[in-house]
Amino acid sequence: MLEKTIYYKMITLKVKNIIKEKLPLKSGDKIIVGVSGGADSIALLHILTELNLDLQLIAIYIDHGLRPDEIPQEISFVKGQAGAVGAEFESISVDVLALKNCDKLSTEDAARRLRYQAFAEARERYGAKYIMVAHNADDQVEEFFIRLLRGSGRRGLSGMPYQNGLLLRPLLSLTKADLLLYLQERGIDHCEDSSNREPCYLRNRIRLDLLPRLEEYNPSLRRTILNTSSILESEEDFLEKSARELFNRSTRINREGKLPKTELDCRSFSGGHQALQRRVIELICWQMDAQPSFTHIENICRLATEGTSAKTLQLGSGLRVKKEISQVVFHYPLGRIATRQGEREIRLERRIDGEGIFAIPELNRQLTISTGEGAGEGRLLVDREKINFPLLLRFHRAGEKFHPLGAPGRKKVSRFLTDKKVHGEDKQLYPVLINGDGNIIAIVGLAIAAQFKKTETSKQLISIGWQETTT
């Protein structure tokens, strides 16, 4: 092995300082290290070892199934490098093309998803504390342009952080040239990934075509971009903290049910700057497992700040945003399901053979059929002798009518629901319960049909309950 040079010492010292200042590593920590065999990851593996931090390293190689002619040699090489530094080694195969075709993703996106999923599973399997990858300053510049072309805002253009949860990136301050020189001085070999030269990948086109062209206008472009990302990162931190403060002042999260409900106070929210308002709405949606588009965020902001009321917006996965006087409520009235046009249609046809408690996951509700008067809000009582099992719980049909108890005659179910201030897709929350003879017994949770009412001569009653699922 060659004599340690001054440049080698500079590189290792730089990484050591980054770890000390920005990363939470401690002696004895077990770390998953992503090692592809390329210069960056091989340098990372050796630098971590030579820093003598007493880390337990597990080198993980991901076979994406895209370069079958090169993979065996790479696996053998990485295994040898891991053994040379005393690290454990595992090769994991993933099927990128299957995910790409199934979810209509680009090859790059599918590979990234599967790669990080494999790292996360390996971390659990080995009981490791963190995952470490070899992203460097050149990757940071390329990522800036990838995100810029995709329309990212300040947060995205701030670049990749040194730490993102359990993911650590200790090489972000080093360039590709730094790492290649490190390997050269240490006499360490590395693999060349042939796919890095293929123009079909966006990152490659940026690295091989766009950046060289832009550097004709600004030879210091890469340093300029890194400086810009650093400025944006600092400003992003300030904005994020300010948005959190507005979020804490203006929202209340109710976790009593199976799915969370968030209430946004319009007055407190309206006092915030528009930039912070957008972030608060995005934060609410993410916390409720929804991915809002720019249009969603803008519409919700208008709903909260303008003087409109009783308006409802639909987001994907069943999330509903409703204006209620002085607040906006985010909730899942039908459960976490697709409700928008073009997504999976909700269907409901449930046979009820007798008494019991019946989960209706389609609506995040449960139906209870029991003998006696029962107890609980929203229970309806009907004459047992008039009930013919099996019953059927389903959505009402267009034009379907029944005779509500207390009404002078028959009425369309849809019109009855409208009269009860139940509108739009909220009507699905109140399906009809059909008797064995085909007649409507009740709109569950709201009303029974007059012909099934209890009378003085009723010998036994059936109680019909309809509650939101809370367990």
From Swiss-Prot:
Keywords: ATP-binding, Cytoplasm, Ligase, Nucleotide-binding, tRNA processing
Organism: Desulfotalea psychrophila (strain LSv54 / DSM 12343)
Similarity comment: Belongs to the tRNA(Ile)-lysidine synthase family.
PANTHER family: TRNA(ILE)-LYSIDINE SYNTHASE-RELATED
Biological process terms in GO annotation: tRNA modification
GO cellular component, as recorded: cytoplasm
Protein localization: Cytoplasm
Chief location bin: cytoplasm
Function: Ligates lysine onto the cytidine present at position 34 of the AUA codon-specific tRNA(Ile) that contains the anticodon CAU, in an ATP-dependent manner. Cytidine is converted to lysidine, thus changing the amino acid specificity of the tRNA from methionine to isoleucine.
Annotated catalysed reactions: cytidine(34) in tRNA(Ile2) + L-lysine + ATP = lysidine(34) in tRNA(Ile2) + AMP + diphosphate + H(+)
Free-text comment about domains: The N-terminal region contains the highly conserved SGGXDS motif, predicted to be a P-loop motif involved in ATP binding.
Protein name, as recorded: tRNA(Ile)-lysidine synthase
EC nos: 6.3.4.19
